[in-house]
């Protein structure tokens, strides 16, 4: 009986430790250097750290989140490690920025989207290539890929030298509506994460892509604080719902309006 109790206690301790450890793995593992050719990093002139991510959708345009807007944005493309420079890395600044609303008046559950026109086009290369816009809306149950240079621990922040990637699941919006106070009953956003916690986007990942079944379906918007908590999936701007606005802006119709 004593031996059984000892073994049972050891099992409980192991399970407890495993649960706590998994809660710290926010960004997953290092991304393969060849899987994020479309991923860009946003920073400001005086900053030493990237404050957001973005997605290159063609040679001249980047899609990110409105919350990522800053006065002096710089954009780095073709990067993997912050310590080792790729030969084909390129830097750009915005020529124009477009929003559904002013970046100061967007809501955390609606219209968190920013379309950036680069000051000059980029060329495809070993580490740079655009990601196509989605041809179909996502469906609940999809496996989705997240990536970025954001913190891999929370609430204490640890920023990696390379982007981290993880797989999460797409849930019905009602899951996020129940998890986060203040969310409206309907929204042009997606709800994605891992219900047991442990995998999530976090500070520094905003604006980056949510790729579901190979299609660019979401833009990292916001989530719980601390990040990666159980039953608190993240909220992502739904790209498919904004396709008409994006395509109109790119085509030159700069007065196009976003969906209500």
Swiss-Prot record:
One of its GO terms (cellular component) is extracellular region. Residues 25-251 form the Peptidase S1 domain. Glycans are attached at residues 83, 123-124, 156, 172, 253. Disulfide bonds join 31-165, 52-68, 100-258, 144-212, 176-191, 202-227. Expressed by the venom gland. Residues 19-24 form a propeptide. It is found in: Secreted. Residues 1-18 form the signal peptide. Its main location: secreted. The keyword Transmembrane helix does not apply. Keywords: Disulfide bond, Glycoprotein, Hemostasis impairing toxin, Secreted, Serine protease homolog, Signal, Toxin. One of its GO terms (biological process) is proteolysis. GO terms for molecular function: serine-type endopeptidase activity; toxin activity. The keyword Signal applies. Snake venom serine protease homolog that may act in the hemostasis system of the prey. Belongs to the peptidase S1 family. Snake venom subfamily. This is Snake venom serine protease homolog KN4. It comes from Trimeresurus stejnegeri. The lineage of its organism: Eukaryota, Metazoa, Chordata, Craniata, Vertebrata.
